[in-house]
From Swiss-Prot:
This is COX3 mRNA-specific translational activator PET494. GO terms for cellular component: mitochondrial inner membrane; mitochondrion. GO terms for molecular function: translation regulator activity. Required for the expression of the mitochondrial gene for cytochrome c oxidase subunit III (COX3). It comes from the Eukaryota. Its main location: mitochondrion.
Amino acid sequence: MHLKKGKRSISTVWRLLWKRFYSVNSKTNMHFSRSRKKPVTNFTRTNGLLLSCNGDTFPYLRTLWRYFNAPGNLMFVTTNIVAFMGIVTYNTLVTISSERAFEEQMMAAQVSLAKQREELETTALSLPRDIELRGEEDDIKWEQPDVAHVREDPLVEEQNAKLDTPIKQYTLGDLILNKRENVTDYDSQRAKASIFHMLYAYMLYRDVIQPTTMTQNNNSEEWRREVELLTKGKEVQGTHRRIDVFYDLWNKNFDKIVTSPEKVQNFQLPNWSKYPTILKFICTELHDNSLKTLGEFKQFYGKVRSNEVKKLLGLWLYDHSFLFPHNIYDNRTEEDFYDILINDSMQDNRIFQKYSSIVMNPYNERTQLFFPNVNSPSVNKPVPSISLETYTRLLKGYINLQETGCKYDYNDNIFKLISILKLNCFLQRNKKKHAGPTVRILLPRDEDRSQILGTISQAEKRTCYQILSKNRDVVALLKRISDIQADSS
């Protein structure tokens, strides 16, 4: 009797525990299975938490329950969940730490630039006035070479005037104008006329001021005769072969003359068979290229191999960019061309500052030519933006200029670029499916700045900083800025 009561009490306790934790009633049938001779227990559902659905509705529920009911499997799943939460927590802490480190690097770079500015201002105040005036006089002497002219015999001048030149001189009676033919595109025709006359004048200027070389000996007899006419009886003193000085003189005195409406209307490239090799190539490319868009000018520029000609074309394009139409949104290829111009002008301070001013000055109209726009609903007009690659190339150029130890101070430009990155960065969603967002920098005008930047949320800013903190080029440039201050102190 005691054994039966003990069995009943154990069965009762088991039934209560099962019902307590699983809300399921168990009924033990008193029949035995034929194989194992053990009582068979049937379970009935009464709103249980785990077994609240029968097997017909979810056929895999019983298998899932058996899997989790095993102690080893439950421990394995729990361990994986804990490990996953630990990895997520660690990754979050690392991301926050890198974001803070990047912000601290930007602040350290700005503080470093401020200290350098104070030191330079103190040094400038302590310099005597005569040293500054002497430096300005040296610049004037360097930029404007002296040319001494010797008086020629009037008979010699008259004979020289009668000699032939590479460009045949025509009288009014020799010209036969076809009035029915009109210029198909005035801007492209003007660009061709301007580029041709500029490079033709530069080739003469180059051959006149420099000593005779093997390249000049290979020129045609007509071209050498033209050079001799320009140098005969004249003695050149203190002249320097500076491209920027030549371009300023040509642009100021001759560009408007050779590109007057009448001359542009009737402009045709002359017979260039007697020209030097470089000028022959230029004339051939100008003839084959329509030169109507900036993309076509990019093709023309990319085929040129002479660094001198590329510098002249870079100076010319900055002053004549109005000849090419502006795209409103799709300017990806134009921004690539801007990067090429910046990269080619790294060794030329003046050209680099010209093109960097397009980014530094938001009112520069050339931003609409080179950079794609972002439609901003807050101001209801497009806003130009630059890529992170373009930004890093500009910042690198100014840091290189500052590290060369030149007499000019570029701390203000570097400081402004850091502020632009810190305030104007935003995320641009990539149209490709598997590509993440990219960081771009807005270039708003002062009157639109607060409205446009107000649309960028703090969460988007933090995401931008996270991406920037992982960009090796940006982090390395910020470190170089801090190192400049450390070396100077």
